[in-house]
Amino acid sequence: MSVQQRRLPVYKKILEENKKKWMIKEFLEYRLSKYGYIDSEILKTPLGTRIVIYAERPSRIIGRKGAIVKEVSNILATKLGVENPQIDVIDVSKIEAPEMFPKVVAYRIANAMAKGVRFRRVMFAAIRQLTEAGAKGFEIVVSGKLSTERARFEKQTFGKLYKIGYDAKNRVRRAVVHVLLKPGIYGIEVRIAPASLQYSDEYKIKPPVRPEAAAQQQQQ
């Protein structure tokens, strides 16, 4: 850390750190999206900066003999000024079904459309995968020149999915991906309420326990 950075006010230090984290995330998504990149966590440690990458296909991100990870680490250190970057790649399938991550679903739709598959066919395939994975609710929106020269959008929804409020902002997962085809740019937006999500208004009322039953339970 330079002398100038040490003299910065606290709020400016926080802004600088958040700006650098955003730049790292943007670079990782740009460089690794075609290899199954989903998300990342950036953690400051006494030994440097630990970057945890969540991926659908970890072996592709690591590369042959770790070539891709080494290249990314070198760019982060030289171009973005990340101090001693240490990259760990985690397979999301060991944590949760990949279909519960909207970025995975959005990239699958984008890649299929880039190969010439019709958008409706891809959307229905994604709907089938999400329902089989047990998603509580989801919404898929594809926008662009779908069937005419004028841009429009098509939306498919399923289950219980909140669009406003605390749950929608902090618990429902959302991702937006763009794909460039011959007619123009298409946007794919995916929102998913994962199977493990419990909404704030979902609760169970326990039936009252009679005093006699409570006394018997204590005796037992």
UniProtKB/Swiss-Prot annotation:
Keywords: Ribonucleoprotein, Ribosomal protein, RNA-binding, rRNA-binding. The keyword rRNA processing does not apply. InterPro entries: KH_dom (IPR004087), KH_dom-like_a/b (IPR015946), KH_dom_type_2 (IPR004044), KH_sf_prok-type (IPR009019), Ribosomal_S3_C_sf (IPR036419), Ribosomal_uS3_arc (IPR027488), Ribosomal_uS3_C (IPR001351), Ribosomal_uS3_euk/arc (IPR005703). Gene3D superfamilies: 3.30.300.20, Ribosomal protein S3, C-terminal domain (3.30.1140.32). Pfam families: KH_2, Ribosomal_S3_C. One of its GO terms (molecular function) is rRNA binding. PROSITE patterns: KH_TYPE_2. SUPFAM superfamilies: Prokaryotic type KH domain (KH-domain type II), Ribosomal protein S3 C-terminal domain. Residues 24-93 form the KH type-2 domain. GO terms for cellular component: cytosolic small ribosomal subunit. GO terms for biological process: translation. It comes from the Archaea. CDD domains: KH-II_30S_S3_arch. The keyword DNA-binding does not apply. HAMAP family: Ribosomal_uS3_A (MF_01309_A). Part of the 30S ribosomal subunit. Binds the lower part of the 30S subunit head. Belongs to the universal ribosomal protein uS3 family. This is Small ribosomal subunit protein uS3. It comes from Pyrobaculum arsenaticum (strain DSM 13514 / JCM 11321 / PZ6). The lineage of its organism: Archaea, Thermoproteota, Thermoprotei, Thermoproteales, Thermoproteaceae. The gene is rps3.
